[in-house]
C-alpha cells in the first residue's frame, strides 16, 4: 500500500512539472495611456493595432513583472513590414520607464486623478538596455515608432522581444505588434513650444552620468548639441538662453565691453538643429527675498576670474550704468548677427500683485533703452500696466482674466 501511495505521489509531481521561466513572469502589452505604477500587478491585455497618419509617431507600452529579480533586460523591435514585404523606413526606439517620487500631492485634486500608493509616478524613459528589476515590481517598457511622411498606407507588423535573466536562467519573450498607416500626412506642428533647460555645471554633471563637465569645453558643446537634437525630436521650437550667463563682460572706468562668442555659439547650435523659431532671453532680475518680495536686476561682476551676478536696485548707479549699455548692445548685436531670429526678453519670473511696482520699473527701463525689444513673461496678474508684449499666464490666472487676455490676443 505504501508503495502505491509513493507511486501516486511521484506521478502527481511529475505531472505538475517544474515551472518554466516564462511561467513566473507576467509579460503583457498594455494601453499606452495606462499608467503603470511600481505596485501595479494587473495588466489588462491590449492587442490593438495602433492607427497613425504618415508623419506621426506610433507608441506601444509593455509591462513586465516577476516573482524573482530580473537582470540584464534588453528590448528589441524588428522592422515593421507590410504584407507586400515593404518596410517602414524608420528606427523604432525602446526605453525602460523610470519613476519620480512625488513628496506632496496637488491640493484639490480632480475626482478622477490616478493615485500611486507608493507615490512613485512614471516619468523619464531610459533608452538604455541592461536594466534590472526587483521582484514583485512592475516595469513598463515604451516603444516609439516614427512613421515617415512618405510611408505607404497599410498595416505593418513587427516583433517586440524582451531578453534577460531570472536567477541563472536566460529568457526571451516575444509579442507581435502592428501599425496601421492611413493615407494622410500629418503636417509639422505650428505651435510655439518651449522647454526650459539649464547648462550650469550641476545640471551638466547630471546629464554626464555624475562626471564633472568643464563649461564651454568640447564635451560641454557635444552635450549641448545632443540636447538640441533631442529638443528637435520633441518639437520644441522656442529656446531660452541667458545673456547674462553666456556673454562675457569687461568693465573699465564705468564703460563695458561685451564678448558674444559663446552666446552666439549656443544660438548657432540650436539654429542648425531647427528648433529656433523664437529665442527667449533669460531673466535679468529676480526676487530679493521671499515670494512676495520686490525684484532687483542682476549686474555681472568678476571675483577671482569667475563671473558672479550681484543684485542692485534698479535705481542704483550700478544697475543703471550696466543696463544702459548692455540692452542697446545686445539688441544691436542680435539685429546684425541674427536678423531673422525673433527675440523676446524675460525680466523676472512670475510677477504678482505684491511686486508689480519693481517689475514694471525694470521693464520700463529696458524699454527706454530699446523700445523695439519684446518682453515676454509668465505672470500671475494682468495688472502690469500693459508693459508686456507676450503674456504667458498660468491656466488658473488665464481663467480669472479671460476677457483681458482675449483682448490682448485680438490686438496681436
Residue ranges and their predicted role:
Residues 2-9:
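Sec-dependent signal peptide recognition
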Residues 14-15:
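C-terminal motif of bacterial Sec signal peptides marking the signal peptidase cleavage site
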Residues 21-44, 67-143:
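Surface-exposed binding patches on compact interaction domains or structured appendages
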Residues 48-72, 219-222, 226, 231:
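Solvent-exposed, low-complexity, repeat-rich "mucin-like" stalks and linkers
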Residues 67-69, 146-153:
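Short, surface-exposed loop/turn segments at beta-strand-coil junctions that are enriched for proline
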Residues 130, 146, 157-164, 171-369, ...:
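Aromatic-lined carbohydrate-binding surfaces of glycoside hydrolases
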Residues 325, 385-412:
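Glycoside hydrolase catalytic-domain groove-lining segments
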Amino acid at each position: 500500500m505504501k508503495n502505491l501511495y509513493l507511486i501516486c505521489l511521484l506521478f502527481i509531481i511529475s505531472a505538475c512539472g517544474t515551472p518554466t521561466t516564462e511561467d513566473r513572469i507576467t509579460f503583457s502589452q498594455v494601453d499606452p495611456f495606462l499608467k503603470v505604477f511600481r505596485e501595479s500587478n494587473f495588466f489588462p491585455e491590449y492587442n490593438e493595432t495602433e492607427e497613425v497618419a504618415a508623419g506621426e509617431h506610433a507608441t506601444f507600452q509593455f509591462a513586465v513583472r516577476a516573482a524573482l529579480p530580473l537582470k540584464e533586460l534588453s528590448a528589441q523591435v524588428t522592422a515593421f513590414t507590410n504584407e507586400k514585404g515593404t518596410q517602414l523606413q524608420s528606427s523604432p526606439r525602446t526605453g525602460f520607464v523610470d519613476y519620480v517620487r512625488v513628496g506632496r500631492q496637488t491640493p484639490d485634486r480632480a475626482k478622477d486623478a490616478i493615485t500611486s500608493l507608493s507615490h512613485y509616478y512614471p516619468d523619464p524613459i531610459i533608452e538604455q538596455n541592461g536594466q534590472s528589476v526587483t521582484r514583485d515590481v512592475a516595469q513598463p517598457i515604451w516603444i516609439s515608432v516614427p512613421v515617415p511622411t512618405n510611408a505607404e498606407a497599410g498595416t505593418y507588423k513587427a516583433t517586440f522581444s524582451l531578453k534577460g535573466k531570472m536567477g541563472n536562467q536566460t529568457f526571451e519573450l516575444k509579442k507581435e505588434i502592428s501599425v496601421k498607416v492611413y493615407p494622410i500626412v500629418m503636417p509639422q506642428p505650428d505651435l510655439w513650444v518651449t522647454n526650459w533647460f539649464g547648462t550650469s555645471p550641476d545640471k551638466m554633471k547630471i546629464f554626464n552620468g555624475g562626471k564633472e563637465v568643464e563649461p564651454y569645453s568640447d564635451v560641454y558643446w557635444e552635450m549641448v548639441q545632443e540636447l538640441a537634437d533631442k529638443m528637435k525630436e520633441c518639437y520644441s521650437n522656442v529656446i531660452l538662453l541667458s545673456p547674462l550667463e553666456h556673454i562675457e563682460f569687461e568693465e573699465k572706468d564705468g564703460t563695458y565691453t561685451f564678448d558674444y562668442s559663446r552666446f552666439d555659439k549656443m544660438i548657432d547650435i540650436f539654429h542648425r538643429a531647427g528648433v529656433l523659431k523664437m529665442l527667449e532671453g533669460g531673466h535679468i532680475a529676480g526676487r530679493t527675498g521671499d515670494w512676495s518680495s520686490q525684484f532687483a536686476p542682476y549686474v555681472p561682476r568678476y571675483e577671482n576670474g569667475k563671473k558672479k551676478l550681484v543684485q542692485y536696485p534698479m535705481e542704483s548707479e550700478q544697475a543703471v550704468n550696466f543696463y544702459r549699455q548692455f540692452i542697446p548692445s545686445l539688441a544691436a548685436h542680435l539685429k546684425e548677427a541674427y536678423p531673422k531670429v525673433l527675440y523676446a526678453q524675460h525680466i523676472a519670473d512670475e510677477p504678482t500683485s505684491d511686486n508689480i511696482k519693481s517689475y514694471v520699473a525694470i521693464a520700463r527701463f529696458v524699454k527706454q533703452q530699446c523700445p523695439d525689444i519684446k518682453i515676454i513673461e509668465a505672470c500671475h496678474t494682468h495688472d502690469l500696466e500693459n508693459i508686456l508684449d507676450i503674456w504667458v499666464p498660468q491656466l488658473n490666472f488665464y481663467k480669472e482674466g479671460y476677457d483681458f487676455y482675449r483682448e490682448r490676443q485680438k490686438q496681436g
